[in-house]
Amino acid sequence: MPKNYIDSRGWKYRVMSGLGENAFKARYQRADHQGDVGWKGLATVPWRESREAAQADLDRLAEKKGWKEWIG
């Protein structure tokens, strides 16, 4: 089950697909945006060929940074 995260600033983080069939990356959305607007790729993680690998990157980063799980 994919997990989404939120930090102390209200920025949200989740894994999303990119262009192409096998392109996934963790992305963030600033607190002043809602819905599908304003999602940007995290520069600190690479593109991955599977959603699971990208989720593992995000999970490790969230644990390191102390982000909380976000249901959204």
Residue ranges and their predicted role:
Residues 54, 66-69:
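Acidic, low-complexity intrinsically disordered segments
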Residues 58, 70-71:
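Eukaryotic low-complexity, intrinsically disordered regulatory segments enriched in serine, proline
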